[in-house]
Swiss-Prot record:
Residues 87-91 are annotated as: Connecting peptide. Monomer. GO terms for biological process: lens development in camera-type eye; visual perception. Crystallins are the dominant structural components of the vertebrate eye lens. PROSITE patterns: CRYSTALLIN_BETA_GAMMA. Keywords: Eye lens protein, Repeat. This is Gamma-crystallin M1. Belongs to the beta/gamma-crystallin family. It comes from Cyprinus carpio (Common carp). Has a two-domain beta-structure, folded into four very similar Greek key motifs. InterPro entries: Beta/Gamma-Crystallin, Beta/gamma_crystallin, G_crystallin-like. Coiled coil: none annotated. Residues 2-40, 41-86, 92-132, 133-175 form the Beta/gamma crystallin 'Greek key' domain.
């Protein structure tokens, strides 16, 4: 089981909130998050309540202040919800599709891909089916830019999920011991 502790000030000072599962509204416990300690497991933190907005992946470690987290690639300064990524030790497999509802060109993916356009000759893809494993998708090649967490399931339309202007350009398996 994972455990993440949110503090309302930098350097683990002030009030804290211990979390060992998903939390859709951290603001119920703290008015702001200034630092984070992940004692075990892996988590996605979200800019808005109910797992909405920009996302950032956290593994076990200490995150002393939001400014440091922003220098690591996090592009937002407010954390309102978090989701625990369950431990997983199996194979990784997904299918990506050029169009909504699993239409158009399809490719099966089983490993990390630092540049989807180069490897698969796809400038864009609009749906996917994650069969096995947990994945991070990135808006730029080489695992840069904003990221999104995808767990096993069918994702028929990125546009319907609120990603209408989004292009995923690289993807990585979450292989950490979460």
């Amino acid at each position: 089981m994972g455990k993440i502790i949110f503090y309302d000030d930098r350097n683990f000072q002030g009030r804290s909130y211990d979390c060992m599962s998903d939390c859709s509204d951290i603001s119920s416990y703290l008015s702001r998050v200034g630092s984070i300690r992940v004692e075990s497991g892996c988590f996605m933190v979200y800019e808005r309540n109910s797992y909405m907005g920009n996302q950032f992946f956290l593994r076990r470690g200490e995150y002393h202040d939001m400014q440091r987290m922003m220098s690591m690639g996090m592009i937002f300064d407010t954390i309102r919800s978090c989701r625990m990524i369950p431990p997983y030790r199996g194979s990784y497999r997904m299918r990506i599709y050029e169009r909504d509802n699993f239409g158009g060109q399809m490719h099966e993916v089983m490993d990390d891909c630092d540049n989807i356009m180069e490897r698969y000759r796809m400038s864009d893809w609009q749906s996917c089916h994650v069969m096995d494993g947990h994945w991070l998708f990135y808006e730029q090649p080489h695992y840069r830019g904003r990221m999104w967490y995808f767990r096993p399931g069918e994702y028929r339309s990125f546009r319907d999920m609120g990603y209408s202007n989004m292009r995923f350009m690289s993807m990585r398996r979450i292989t950490d011991i979460c």
